[in-house]
Every structure is written in C-alpha cells, then in structure tokens.
Amino acid sequence: MTKNLLNYLNELEAWLTNYVNEAHAQGVVVGLSGGVDSAVVAAMTKKLFPQNHLTLVMHINNSELDHKATTALVEQLQLNNKQVDLEPPYRAMLQALTIDPQKELMVAGNLKARLRMACLYTHAQKHNYLVLGTGNFIEYSLGYFTKWGDGACDVAPLAFLLKSDVYALSQHFNVPELVIERAPTASLFAGQTDEAEMGLTYKELDQYFQGHLQLSATKQQRVDHLRQSSQHKRSLPKTFKPLYSFQI
C-alpha cells in the first residue's frame, strides 16, 4: 500500500469516527456481501467500533461462493454478525407485484437490493446505528448501484477510492484471499459480474479516471452513456421552484 493511500486511510478513519460521534449514533451497521468492498468497510468498522458494529448477511438466493466468502470474513475478522433470511419476503413481494424473476432479471434483482436496504435501516434504527455504504468511486461514477438499494446509506467511506485502492486496503486489513480473488459481482442474479455489465474492466476504469488511459471510441461512448444515464442516482430528488420565500 502506498504512503499516500495509508495517509488517506488514517484521515478517513479519524473522520468517520468523528462523524459517527457527532451524529450521536451508537455505532454502525454494514451489509456483508462476500465481496471485497464490503469486506474492507467491515474490517474498518471492526477496527474503529470493535463493540458497536454489526454486519448483516442477508440471504436472497445467495450463491455457495457468497456463503463461503461471508463465513470466512466473519470468522477471520471476528465480526459481530447476524444472518437474516430475506427469501420469504422476497418471494412474497415477487408474487404481490407479479414479477417474473426469469423474465425481469433487473427488476427482481433491484428488488433484492431494496429489501436489503430496508433490512439494514431497520437494524440501524433498532440500535441507533448509522448505515455504512460499500460503493467505490467507479461504481458511484458510473451509477453501478441500485437507487434506494445498495446506493442508500448514511456514510460512503469508499466513495473516492478506486477499485485498486480497495484491493490494496483488503491486503492491509487481512481480508481472506477467497474474497479478494473472486470476480466482483452485485449478486443480483446468477452469473452476474460487474465488469461484464459495465463493459470495461476495473483496471481500465481506474487508469481512465486517473488520466492514464485513452479508451477506444466504443468504450468511451459506454462510459459517457453510463455517467449520463445515471446522473439522477447521484442527485437529490428534483423539485419545482419555491412557492414561498423559505427554502428546504
């Protein structure tokens, strides 16, 4: 890990601790997916809030690799953890909303993310905790998250870190190799991977946003499209002009 990244991490940890204290929260909660991003956030919270942290593994058709990865994380990092079975409410919602998960993959997948969000915030309210997001800079920049799903959080610690930074931090925090080596995925449906959906690798995107790589015309168009079409995800809800003199 570079000295610059280590200094950033130290500042981030001090800022996060102070933010939680100033919010008068008792601790933090993190959704644990088995991916490297959530692993790094979980490891950081274990360090900063050893007693007052909670990680949730929320089961909705989770893969065997998801199970192995989250189990390894909880055991190796000694995380406070709760397992939550969201399969019954997920099935009930599919039926109530007449969603066919085989024909409407993204609709059903985003429903999973929003159910997990509701679970995280319910536990946060129960314990007076803040919800920590796990998205990195690439995901936020390209809108690679579910609006009001995994994009919903109180604090986003990794928002200005590239994927390569996250991998470096995973080594620093002694994240299990199983987690580090697996292909990044949002786990919204079987076989999904981040890079296949984005159309570029994280390495390419890291280099591009640092100004070290010129993309092909096709890939540049893909990045431009993803950024433009996801702008609404990075903005507050649109409002009309005020009727009165006071502001929100």
Swiss-Prot record:
Q: Name one GO biological process term.
A: NAD biosynthetic process
Its UniProt pathway annotation is: Cofactor biosynthesis; NAD(+) biosynthesis; NAD(+) from deamido-NAD(+) (ammonia route): step 1/1
Which reactions is this enzyme annotated as catalysing? deamido-NAD(+) + NH4(+) + ATP = AMP + diphosphate + NAD(+) + H(+)
Q: Which ranges form a coiled coil?
A: none
Q: Which GO terms fall under molecular function for this chain's record?
A: ATP binding; glutaminase activity; metal ion binding; NAD+ synthase (glutamine-hydrolyzing) activity; NAD+ synthase activity
Q: Which residues bind Mg(2+)?
A: D37, E139
Question: What keywords appear on the UniProt entry?
Answer: ATP-binding, Ligase, Magnesium, Metal-binding, NAD, Nucleotide-binding
Q: Does the keyword ATP-binding apply?
A: yes
Q: What is its EC number?
A: 6.3.1.5
The record describes its quaternary structure and partners as: Homodimer.
This one is known as NH(3)-dependent NAD(+) synthetase
